[in-house]
């Protein structure tokens, strides 16, 4: 009996150009459309790969933002309205798609800042929270010091002058107590109701703003890295105030927030929050969301305009950094969308390690 022949499939040339480029979008079809459209006399093979990669990236970016919009509107499916919200609430995408009409996407009303409650009178504090002098002011200070025969190290004096002028322009700003270093603002995002989120590289205890957030436990201990720095900078007075609070309330429940004076800190207030542990992933993110909401609600009761957060949850609470950052940013955005008005105008994320900075910069882009 004759042996059956084995059929060996040919493997050469079986992979498409898209798979070789690591893309889901069809590179061959894009190349064919480029040639058919007569956009140029010669179309290189690499141009189709590059264009397909850009289209794939933009599609993924819009879908992610549209998914966030659908989630915020309590919808389980993405519709054209969510795509419209995603594109128009992102500064770069809005510029890219200027003049583009999204069918069935509806319209996005433009709300003038003066019509937003408390926005007009609080706009003078837009950039007075941090002791970060403008580049031109720093150059002028260095030039003045050089002409006066002083060392260039006198930049701190210009910082003090900048902070004093900012406090003069805004009566609600915290008066400078001591000169501190300038801060580097790495990225920012303005929400649709006017609040601005900043990612900052610096020291939380040297921030000049209305309040700083202290992640703690049920006893409001200063044992953590952030807590130890806050305790050392604030002084013994904060211990007495915390002990007084604990004698009345016995403990700070998980997700709850309490507020004390800043004492020797440049900030007027310290908002203590009992941050949850990442023991159960299903409930930990909800608990962290509620923690952030409680902190912002308490800040609003004190008419706080500027508040600074460290990287909450990613230390002793064992949250993965990207999950903690995503949860915190979404919680802040959802809080401002759920209330009629808020005294908070600026939220700073004061970070010192490069990993946290990279994570917050990446997540801030996707916040709407």
Swiss-Prot record:
PANTHER family: HISTONE H2A (PTHR23430). Pfam families: Histone, Histone_H2A_C, Macro. It is found in: Nucleus; Chromosome. Residues 184-368 form the Macro domain. CDD domains: HFD_H2A (cd00074). The lineage of its organism: Eukaryota, Filasterea, Capsaspora. This is Histone macroH2A1.1. The macro domain specifically binds poly-ADP-ribose. Binds poly-ADP-ribose with much higher affinity compared to vertebrate macroH2A1.1 orthologs. The nucleosome is a histone octamer containing two molecules each of H2A, H2B, H3 and H4 assembled in one H3-H4 heterotetramer and two H2A-H2B heterodimers. PROSITE patterns: HISTONE_H2A, MACRO. A glycoprotein binds at residues 203-204, 225-226, 275, 313-317. Changing residue 225 to E: Reduced affinity for poly-ADP-ribose. GO terms for molecular function: ADP-D-ribose binding; ADP-D-ribose modification-dependent protein binding; DNA binding; protein heterodimerization activity; structural constituent of chromatin. GO terms for cellular component: nucleosome; nucleus. Belongs to the histone H2A family.
């Amino acid at each position: 009996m004759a042996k059956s022949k084995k059929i060996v499939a040919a493997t050469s040339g079986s992979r498409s150009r898209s798979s070789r480029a690591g893309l889901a979008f069809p590179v061959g079809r894009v190349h064919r459309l480029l040639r058919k459209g007569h956009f140029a006399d010669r179309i290189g093979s690499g141009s189709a790969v590059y264009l397909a990669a850009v289209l794939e990236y933009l599609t993924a970016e819009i879908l992610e933002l549209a998914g966030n919009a659908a989630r915020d509107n309590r919808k389980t499916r993405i519709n054209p309205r969510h795509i419209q919200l995603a594109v128009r609430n992102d500064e770069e995408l809005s510029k890219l798609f200027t003049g583009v009409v999204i069918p069935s996407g509806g319209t996005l009303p433009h709300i003038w800042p003066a019509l937003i409650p408390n926005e007009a009178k609080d706009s003078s504090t837009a950039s007075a929270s941090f002791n970060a002098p403008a580049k031109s002011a720093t150059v002028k200070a260095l030039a003045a010091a050089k002409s006066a025969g002083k060392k260039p190290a006198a930049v701190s004096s210009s910082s003090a002058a900048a902070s004093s002028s900012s406090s003069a322009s805004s009566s609600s700003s915290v008066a400078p107590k001591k000169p501190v270093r300038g801060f580097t603002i790495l990225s920012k995002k303005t929400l649709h109701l006017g609040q601005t989120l900043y990612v900052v590289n610096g020291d939380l205890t040297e921030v000049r703003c209305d309040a700083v957030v202290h992640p703690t436990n049920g006893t409001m201990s200063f044992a953590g890295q952030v807590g130890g720095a806050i305790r050392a900078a604030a002084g013994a007075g904060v211990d007495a105030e915390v002990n007084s609070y604990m004698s009345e309330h016995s403990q700070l429940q998980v997700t709850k927030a309490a507020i004390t004076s800043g004492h020797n800190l440049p900030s007027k207030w310290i908002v203590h929050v009992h941050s949850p542990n990442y023991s159960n992933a299903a409930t930990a993110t909800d608990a962290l969301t509620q923690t952030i909401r409680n902190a912002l609600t308490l800040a609003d009761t004190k008419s706080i305009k500027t508040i600074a957060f460290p990287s909450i949850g990613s230390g002793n609470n064992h949250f993965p950094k990207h999950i903690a950052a995503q949860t915190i940013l979404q919680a802040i955005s959802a809080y401002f969308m759920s209330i009629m008005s808020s005294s908070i105008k600026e939220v700073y994320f004061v970070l010192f390690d490069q990993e946290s900075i990279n994570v917050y910069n990446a997540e801030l882009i996707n916040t709407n």
